[in-house]
Amino acid sequence: MSLAIRAAGAADHDAIWAALEPVIRAGETYALPRDWSRETALAYWFAPAHEVFVAGETLGTYFLQANQQGGGAHVANCGYITSLAATGRGVARAMCAHSLERARERGFRAMQFNLVVATNTRAVALWQTMGFAITGTLPGAFAHPTLGDVDAHVMYRRL
Protein backbone atom coordinates (compact mmCIF):
# COMPACT_ATOMS: atom_id res chain seq x y z
CA MET A 1 0.00 0.00 0.00
CA SER A 2 1.35 3.42 -0.96
CA LEU A 3 0.30 5.74 1.83
CA ALA A 4 1.47 9.24 2.68
CA ILE A 5 2.89 9.24 6.21
CA ARG A 6 3.83 12.53 7.81
CA ALA A 7 4.76 14.02 11.16
CA ALA A 8 1.74 14.68 13.36
CA GLY A 9 0.94 17.89 15.17
CA ALA A 10 -1.69 19.59 17.28
CA ALA A 11 -4.01 19.90 14.27
CA ASP A 12 -4.18 16.08 14.21
CA HIS A 13 -5.30 15.64 17.82
CA ASP A 14 -9.01 15.15 17.06
CA ALA A 15 -8.36 12.55 14.36
CA ILE A 16 -5.75 10.75 16.45
CA TRP A 17 -8.09 10.64 19.43
CA ALA A 18 -10.77 9.17 17.14
CA ALA A 19 -8.33 6.32 16.35
CA LEU A 20 -7.01 5.92 19.90
CA GLU A 21 -10.25 6.03 21.86
CA PRO A 22 -11.90 2.80 20.65
CA VAL A 23 -8.65 0.86 21.06
CA ILE A 24 -8.07 2.21 24.57
CA ARG A 25 -11.70 1.62 25.59
CA ALA A 26 -11.65 -1.98 24.27
CA GLY A 27 -8.57 -2.73 26.37
CA GLU A 28 -7.64 -5.74 24.25
CA THR A 29 -4.30 -4.72 22.74
CA TYR A 30 -2.72 -1.86 24.71
CA ALA A 31 -1.71 -1.85 28.37
CA LEU A 32 -3.32 1.53 28.95
CA PRO A 33 -6.08 2.42 31.41
CA ARG A 34 -9.42 1.99 29.66
CA ASP A 35 -10.86 5.08 31.35
CA TRP A 36 -8.20 7.51 30.16
CA SER A 37 -9.49 10.92 29.13
CA ARG A 38 -8.77 12.42 25.74
CA GLU A 39 -6.26 14.79 27.33
CA THR A 40 -4.39 12.02 29.16
CA ALA A 41 -4.28 9.75 26.11
CA LEU A 42 -3.00 12.51 23.84
CA ALA A 43 -0.42 13.57 26.43
CA TYR A 44 0.83 9.96 26.47
CA TRP A 45 0.81 9.61 22.66
CA PHE A 46 2.58 12.96 22.20
CA ALA A 47 5.03 12.49 25.10
CA PRO A 48 8.18 14.58 24.65
CA ALA A 49 10.26 11.47 23.85
CA HIS A 50 7.81 10.38 21.11
CA GLU A 51 8.15 11.33 17.46
CA VAL A 52 4.55 10.97 16.23
CA PHE A 53 3.30 10.28 12.70
CA VAL A 54 -0.04 9.91 10.96
CA ALA A 55 -0.89 7.81 7.92
CA GLY A 56 -3.12 9.13 5.18
CA GLU A 57 -6.24 10.92 6.32
CA THR A 58 -5.37 9.69 9.80
CA LEU A 59 -6.06 6.07 8.95
CA GLY A 60 -3.50 5.32 11.61
CA THR A 61 -0.87 6.81 13.85
CA TYR A 62 2.36 5.68 15.42
CA PHE A 63 5.06 6.95 17.72
CA LEU A 64 8.78 6.23 17.65
CA GLN A 65 11.07 6.52 20.65
CA ALA A 66 14.18 5.03 22.21
CA ASN A 67 13.18 1.85 24.04
CA GLN A 68 15.52 2.61 26.95
CA GLN A 69 18.09 5.18 27.98
CA GLY A 70 21.86 4.82 28.22
CA GLY A 71 23.09 1.42 27.06
CA GLY A 72 19.67 0.58 25.57
CA ALA A 73 19.18 3.84 23.68
CA HIS A 74 20.26 2.30 20.35
CA VAL A 75 17.06 0.17 20.31
CA ALA A 76 13.88 1.84 19.04
CA ASN A 77 10.35 1.22 20.23
CA CYS A 78 7.07 2.07 18.52
CA GLY A 79 3.37 2.02 19.23
CA TYR A 80 0.91 1.77 16.33
CA ILE A 81 -2.83 2.22 16.13
CA THR A 82 -4.91 1.81 12.99
CA SER A 83 -8.37 3.34 12.90
CA LEU A 84 -11.11 0.72 13.02
CA ALA A 85 -12.34 1.83 9.57
CA ALA A 86 -8.91 1.13 8.06
CA THR A 87 -8.29 -2.29 9.62
CA GLY A 88 -7.09 -4.87 7.09
CA ARG A 89 -6.10 -2.28 4.47
CA GLY A 90 -2.32 -2.42 4.94
CA VAL A 91 -2.07 0.71 7.08
CA ALA A 92 -0.19 -0.97 9.95
CA ARG A 93 2.24 -2.58 7.48
CA ALA A 94 2.89 0.80 5.83
CA MET A 95 3.41 2.49 9.21
CA CYS A 96 5.79 -0.26 10.33
CA ALA A 97 7.83 0.03 7.13
CA HIS A 98 7.98 3.80 7.60
CA SER A 99 9.01 3.44 11.24
CA LEU A 100 11.80 1.01 10.39
CA GLU A 101 13.21 3.49 7.87
CA ARG A 102 12.80 6.43 10.24
CA ALA A 103 14.49 4.47 13.04
CA ARG A 104 17.46 3.75 10.75
CA GLU A 105 17.63 7.46 9.84
CA ARG A 106 17.79 8.33 13.54
CA GLY A 107 20.65 5.89 14.09
CA PHE A 108 18.81 3.12 15.90
CA ARG A 109 20.28 -0.34 15.35
CA ALA A 110 17.30 -2.46 16.39
CA MET A 111 13.61 -2.21 17.25
CA GLN A 112 11.76 -3.89 20.09
CA PHE A 113 8.07 -4.23 20.93
CA ASN A 114 7.78 -4.75 24.66
CA LEU A 115 4.25 -6.11 25.08
CA VAL A 116 2.53 -7.63 22.05
CA VAL A 117 -0.61 -9.30 23.35
CA ALA A 118 -0.52 -12.92 22.19
CA THR A 119 -4.26 -12.97 21.45
CA ASN A 120 -3.71 -10.11 18.98
CA THR A 121 -2.79 -12.71 16.39
CA ARG A 122 -3.06 -10.35 13.40
CA ALA A 123 -0.45 -8.03 14.92
CA VAL A 124 1.85 -10.90 15.90
CA ALA A 125 1.68 -12.31 12.35
CA LEU A 126 2.21 -8.89 10.77
CA TRP A 127 5.24 -8.08 12.91
CA GLN A 128 6.72 -11.48 12.02
CA THR A 129 6.32 -10.74 8.29
CA MET A 130 8.13 -7.45 8.96
CA GLY A 131 11.13 -9.35 10.32
CA PHE A 132 10.38 -9.34 14.05
CA ALA A 133 10.97 -12.48 16.08
CA ILE A 134 9.31 -13.43 19.34
CA THR A 135 12.26 -13.31 21.72
CA GLY A 136 10.28 -13.98 24.86
CA THR A 137 6.79 -14.75 26.07
CA LEU A 138 5.53 -13.33 29.34
CA PRO A 139 2.97 -15.76 30.80
CA GLY A 140 -0.28 -14.07 31.78
CA ALA A 141 1.30 -10.61 31.51
CA PHE A 142 -1.76 -8.91 30.00
CA ALA A 143 -5.11 -8.63 31.77
CA HIS A 144 -7.52 -9.00 28.86
CA PRO A 145 -11.01 -7.65 29.66
CA THR A 146 -12.85 -10.77 28.45
CA LEU A 147 -10.25 -13.54 28.28
CA GLY A 148 -8.53 -12.93 31.61
CA ASP A 149 -4.76 -13.06 31.92
CA VAL A 150 -3.18 -13.83 28.56
CA ASP A 151 0.42 -14.09 27.41
CA ALA A 152 2.33 -11.20 25.88
CA HIS A 153 5.36 -11.34 23.61
CA VAL A 154 8.53 -9.33 23.41
CA MET A 155 9.33 -8.96 19.70
CA TYR A 156 12.66 -7.78 18.29
CA ARG A 157 14.54 -7.21 15.06
CA ARG A 158 17.83 -5.70 14.05
CA LEU A 159 17.83 -2.79 11.65
Feature locations, PLM:
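Terminal substrate-recognition subdomain of acyl/acetyltransferases
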Residues: S2, Y80-I81, L115, H144-L159
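A short beta-loop-alpha structural element at the N-terminal edge
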Residues: A4-I16
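Acetyl-CoA-dependent GNAT
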Residues: A26-T29, P33-A85, C96-H98, R102, ...
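Active-site acidic-Proline motif in GNAT/NAT acetyltransferases
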Residues: Y80-A85, R89, V117-T119
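Conserved GNAT acetyl-CoA-binding A-motif
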Residues: A103-V116
